């Protein structure tokens, strides 16, 4: 029987994986520049970690969680997003204490799991890269996180980006706005989708995020949260906008934008790309915001946080659509050609010596003729070939050839075994 991968998953094969490695390496380097350090959390957590943080009415909790009971009757869930697990680790390991530098800045990357309809750039097992910063409610930290996201996408070769920002205000703001939304939508209750009917009194802000077209038409004329901001919330958002202006980062204020998770407050943002690879119009690639109550929700003290997450599958699709050049970080330096049965052990030793000197090397393992081996070296774009036949074996030498110039020299095997990099640097004029 031939087995296939589960629906909503993908095999990332060599060739494609180079792009993923480039994304991850670029992210790691940039995160280090911003002084974010890596954190790794389990791929499954107690179910309540996600149900308490994502919100009981969110699509993630109500429709998309991969949750199960283990043999100890513990209710567990595969992680549907990265933030909740990071916050749980922050609280459990008491990283909120005074001995830990604040803001406490970390990043993560890895697979997440949601049961949703697979489509372009959206899988049931998908990969997310994200950052979180705890311990400061400064609007400038919001902007640092936004700038980091914009910088990352730019370094990965994406253009035609649009940054949308909004504020969900503080608790007083949302309480007043929540009631205003209910008052506005209640007369249209029978026209709402079934999901929005459930959400109207539990979390009416989520109706604004409905994918139902009729819901979208109804909320088009809804009150704006910007009209309900407290002076404190207004001051925070004004500083965010002023900081973005100071950095020369273009943005639009989208007063209708809410995030798909219930834990956000104050600043929220989405970075979108305009590419046919993900359908018509702008599509969100990276999104995040501030979540000042999340640490408390998971048993910690009052501690503000801000972060973002991006979907790697969507990002890779965009990079491919924009034909972003991926550097070859592992070119083949030397292909070793062995001629004759007697040279097999010597070829093995030579390849190992070249690798130990810090260069990349390969050889034939299929008993191919010399001509076929040289063709392989050409196809693999080897910088050099190193050929050893029975005569060279008897003379304790090998022939080193530059594939770029055709220049060829004879090299003692002892020199190759001792330091092949030095051989290339001192005895070979064609680099």
UniProtKB/Swiss-Prot annotation:
Record carries keyword Transferase: no
Keywords assigned by UniProt, alphabetized: Aminoacyl-tRNA synthetase, ATP-binding, Cytoplasm, Ligase, Nucleotide-binding, Protein biosynthesis
Name listed for the protein in its UniProt record: Histidine--tRNA ligase
Assigned protein family: Belongs to the class-II aminoacyl-tRNA synthetase family.
Documented EC number(s): 6.1.1.21
Name of the gene: hisS
Quaternary context: Homodimer.
PANTHER family xrefs: HISTIDINE--TRNA LIGASE, MITOCHONDRIAL-RELATED (PTHR43707:SF1), HISTIDYL-TRNA SYNTHETASE (PTHR43707)
Organism: Levilactobacillus brevis (strain ATCC 367 / BCRC 12310 / CIP 105137 / JCM 1170 / LMG 11437 / NCIMB 947 / NCTC 947)
GO biological processes: histidyl-tRNA aminoacylation
One annotated GO molecular function: histidine-tRNA ligase activity
Top-level EC class as recorded in UniProt: ligase
Lineage: Bacteria, Bacillati, Bacillota, Bacilli, Lactobacillales
Annotated compartments: Cytoplasm
Catalysed transformations (reactions): tRNA(His) + L-histidine + ATP = L-histidyl-tRNA(His) + AMP + diphosphate + H(+)
Cellular compartments per GO CC: cytoplasm
Gene3D superfamilies: Anticodon-binding domain (3.40.50.800), Bira Bifunctional Protein, Domain 2 (3.30.930.10)
Ligase listed as a keyword: yes
Segments passing through the bilayer: none
InterPro entries: aa-tRNA-synth_II, aa-tRNA-synth_II/BPL/LPL, Anticodon-bd, Anticodon-bd_dom_sf, His-tRNA-ligase, HisRS-like_core, HisRS/HisZ, HisRS_anticodon
């Amino acid at each position: 029987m031939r087995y296939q991968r589960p629906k909503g998953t993908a095999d990332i094969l060599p060739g494609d994986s180079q792009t993923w490695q480039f994304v991850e390496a670029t992210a790691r380097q940039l995160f280090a520049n911003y002084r974010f350090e890596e954190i790794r959390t389990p791929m499954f957590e107690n179910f309540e970690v996600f149900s308490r943080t994502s919100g009981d009415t969110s699509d993630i909790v109500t429709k998309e969680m991969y949750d199960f009971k283990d043999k100890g009757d513990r209710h567990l869930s595969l992680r549907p997003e990265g933030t909740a697990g990071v916050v749980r680790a922050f609280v459990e390991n008491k990283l909120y204490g005074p001995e830990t530098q604040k803001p406490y800045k970390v990043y993560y990357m890895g697979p997440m799991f949601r049961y949703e309809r697979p489509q372009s750039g959206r899988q049931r097992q998908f990969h997310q890269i994200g950052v979180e910063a705890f311990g400061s409610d400064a609007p400038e930290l919001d902007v640092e996180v936004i700038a980091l996201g914009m910088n990352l996408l730019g370094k990965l070769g994406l253009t035609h980006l649009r940054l949308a920002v909004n504020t969900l205000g503080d608790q007083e703001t949302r309480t007043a706005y929540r009631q205003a939304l209910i008052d506005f939508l209640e007369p249209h209750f029978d026209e709402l989708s079934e999901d929005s009917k459930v959400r109207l009194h539990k979390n009416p802000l989520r109706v604004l995020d409905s994918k139902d077209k009729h819901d979208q038409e109804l909320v088009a004329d809804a009150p704006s949260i910007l009209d309900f901001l407290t002076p404190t919330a207004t001051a925070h958002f004004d500083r965010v906008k002023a900081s973005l202006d100071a950095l020369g980062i273009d943005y639009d204020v989208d007063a209708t934008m809410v995030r798909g998770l219930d834990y956000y407050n104050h600043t929220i943002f989405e970075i979108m790309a305009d590419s046919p690879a993900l359908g018509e119009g702008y599509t969100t690639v990276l999104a995040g915001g501030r979540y000042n109550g999340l640490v408390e929700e998971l048993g910690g003290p009052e501690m503000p946080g801000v972060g973002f997450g991006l979907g790697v599958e969507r990002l890779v699709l965009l990079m491919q659509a924009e034909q972003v050049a991926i550097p070859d970080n592992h070119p083949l330096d030397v292909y070793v050609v062995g001629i004759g049965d007697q040279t097999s052990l010597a070829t093995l030793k030579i390849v190992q010596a070249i690798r130990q000197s810090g260069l990349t090397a390969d050889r034939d393992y299929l008993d191919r003729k010399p001509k076929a081996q040289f063709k392989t070296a050409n196809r693999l774009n080897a910088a050099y070939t190193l050929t050893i036949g029975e005569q060279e074996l008897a003379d304790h030498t090998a022939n080193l050839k530059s594939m770029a110039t055709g220049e060829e020299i004879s090299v003692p095997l002892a020199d190759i075994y001792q330091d092949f990099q030095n051989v290339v640097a001192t005895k070979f004029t064609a680099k």
